[in-house]
Amino acid sequence: MAQQTPLYEQHTLCGARMVDFHGWMMPLHYGSQLDEHHAVRTDAGMFDVSHMTIVDLHGSRTREFLRYLLANDVAKLTKTGKALYSGMLNASGGVIDDLIIYYFTEDFFRLVVNSATREKDLSWITQHAEPYAIDITVRDDLSLIAVQGPNAQEKAATLFTDEQRHAVEGMKPFFGVQAGDLFIATTGYTGEAGYEIAMPNEKAADFWRALVEAGVKPCGLGARDTLRLEAGMNLYGQEMDEGISPLAANMGWTIAWEPADRDFIGREALEMQREKGHEQLVGLVMTEKGVLRNELPVRFTDAQGNQQEGIITSGTFSPTLGYSIALARVPAGIGETAIVQIRNREMPVKVTKPVFVRNGKAVA
């Protein structure tokens, strides 16, 4: 039986089409995925992301533990509330999950991990935390709502108390603050400004309704996927998994190689991959008619004249740009163009950086 978030009833009242998403009943859309997508790019939309897992870590050695557990280095976190994106890797350098870490105090950090990997993540974290005497608290008492879009912060702020408005005033991207009963973070998965707001489960339905009244459009998983793909953001299980290195998933920037004497899980394997060479994640753009879909083959001829083949990890029609875009994992050496096999047709595509839209504007 699929689980329901505390907002399940609100979704049905808003006319959602519900689907089973990794064991959770979640809204796919509320009538028009396209309208929801455009609302986030031009105004304000909101997503129930309560299926994600918030994990609080307490203990005097928490920073030391996270420096070993994660490929990115929490030594960078010195300002209260600052957030960091990282891969959590296995010994062979594969990605167990990608997550966000918030720093509050030396003995209090918060992780936000994916729903699809919840049990695996908790088991891995618990196993490796034992020698560090970390107190692990899974915050199933909290719901999480993402409010995203150019007008999202302004509209969300109409629900805040004076204390909460003051707490978020001037807050830079990738920070979080606890203000009253809300944890408000300037993070998201759309390429737009906004907040991700955690609150007690019993407050979630009223908060959702108030956001609707403030003119924030409910959005489902469908729009969430096209928005994150336009923004060039990875989806676990597609761009990366336990068999795929962050180096092959455009996550090289999340690996803190320095200081060289910091040991973290997967470091040795990554150093070998870096020396030998590895696949890369690129963007693809197809302006001709047709849609780039997941798992379609991508072919190109490298500088030595050798035929090479990669694969589309995520592909869709971009509502913002009006043509098809994709992320693809390919061998090193790809040039500016490639061929994608769509049924019996060989379609030319342009190779770009793996990001297409930022703050509503085309970058590809």
Curated annotation (Swiss-Prot):
EC number of this enzyme: 2.1.2.10
Gene3D superfamilies tied to this protein: Aminomethyltransferase beta-barrel domains, Aminomethyltransferase fragment, Probable tRNA modification gtpase trme, domain 1
One GO process term, biological-process aspect: glycine decarboxylation via glycine cleavage system
Keywords: Aminotransferase, Transferase
Molecular function in Gene Ontology: aminomethyltransferase activity; transaminase activity
Segments crossing the lipid bilayer: none
Enzyme class name: transferase
Keyword field contains Endoplasmic reticulum: no
Domain of life: Bacteria
InterPro entries assigned to the protein according to its UniProt record, in alphabetical order: GCS_T, GCS_T_bac, GCST_C, GCV_T_N, GcvT/YgfZ/DmdA, GcvT/YgfZ_C, TrmE/GcvT_dom1
Record keyword Signal present: no
A single Gene Ontology CC term: glycine cleavage complex
Reaction equation(s) it catalyzes: N(6)-[(R)-S(8)-aminomethyldihydrolipoyl]-L-lysyl-[protein] + (6S)-5,6,7,8-tetrahydrofolate = N(6)-[(R)-dihydrolipoyl]-L-lysyl-[protein] + (6R)-5,10-methylene-5,6,7,8-tetrahydrofolate + NH4(+)
Annotated NCBIfam families: gcvT, PRK00389.1
Function, as annotated: The glycine cleavage system catalyzes the degradation of glycine.
Subunit note: The glycine cleavage system is composed of four proteins: P, T, L and H.
Similarity comment text for this entry: Belongs to the GcvT family.
Protein name, UniProt field: Aminomethyltransferase
Organism of origin: Salmonella dublin (strain CT_02021853)
Gene name in the database record: gcvT
